[in-house]
């Protein structure tokens, strides 16, 4: 393949468009950040605040893990004494498996993937899909003390909302 320089021999402007375009910075609309308040205003974020931020005291951070990850690694977890082998199945405290569990407010198991082993999982919260998949494979789910408190609070708020209607 021929070089670009060689291909452009004989052309007047070497790919620069009109002969006027390569003079100074006029074709670019100025140098650097010039025109940010005038002719290039559309390239900048709008000024001012917008949106809503929830108060910090009501925000909760969840550490999550999918049942797929637990199921795929359960034999390794048992070898590392993180999971216990019992009656042909495995008992796993999910808080010991999730790396971010110490920094998070609670640990939740999500339902992505398949469950092939009989698992007894202990965690603060479970998605409906995770609960169904674990129980469908012959296992069970158990809530921690924190999980039971959270569930009781959720039921209280649901009852209060139902009373208001």
From Swiss-Prot:
Protein keywords? Ribonucleoprotein, Ribosomal protein, RNA-binding, rRNA-binding
- Show the PROSITE patterns listed in the entry: RIBOSOMAL_L15
Instruction: Cite a single GO MF annotation.
Output: rRNA binding
Gene3D superfamilies the UniProt entry points to: 3.100.10.10, 4.10.990.10
* Region of interest (Disordered), residue spans: 1-59, 133-165
> Where do Basic residues bias regions lie?
1-29
Q: Does the keyword rRNA-binding apply?
A: yes
Q: Where is the composition biased (Basic and acidic residues)?
A: 30-47
Q: Does the keyword rRNA-binding apply?
A: yes
Query: Bias regions of kind Acidic residues — which residues?
Result: 154-165
Identify the SUPFAM superfamilies for this entry: Ribosomal proteins L15p and L18e
Identify one Gene Ontology CC term for this UniProt entry: cytosolic large ribosomal subunit
Q: Which residues cross the membrane?
A: none
HAMAP family from the xrefs? Answer: Ribosomal_uL15 (MF_01341)
Assigned protein family: Belongs to the universal ribosomal protein uL15 family.
Function, please?
A: Binds to the 23S rRNA.
Q: How does it assemble?
A: Part of the 50S ribosomal subunit. Interacts weakly with proteins L18e and L32e.
Q: What is this protein called?
A: Large ribosomal subunit protein uL15
Per the UniProt record, the source organism is: Haloarcula marismortui (strain ATCC 43049 / DSM 3752 / JCM 8966 / VKM B-1809)
């Amino acid at each position: 393949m021929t070089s670009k320089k060689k291909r452009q021999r004989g052309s007047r402007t070497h790919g620069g468009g009109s002969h006027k375009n390569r003079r100074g910075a006029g074709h670019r609309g100025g140098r650097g950040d010039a025109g940010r308040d005038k002719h290039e205003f559309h390239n900048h974020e709008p000024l001012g605040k917008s949106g809503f931020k929830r108060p910090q005291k009501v925000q909760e951070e969840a550490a999550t893990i999918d049942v797929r990850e637990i199921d795929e690694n359960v034999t390794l977890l048992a070898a590392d004494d993180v999971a216990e082998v019992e009656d042909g199945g495995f008992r796993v405290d999910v808080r010991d498996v999730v790396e971010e569990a110490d920094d998070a407010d609670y640990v939740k198991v999500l339902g992505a993937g398949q469950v092939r082993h009989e698992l007894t999982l202990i965690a603060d919260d479970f998605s409906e899909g995770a609960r169904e998949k674990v129980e469908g494979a012959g296992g069970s789910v158990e809530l921690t003390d924190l999980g039971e408190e959270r569930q009781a609070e959720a039921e209280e708020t649901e009852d209060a909302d139902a009373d208001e209607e």
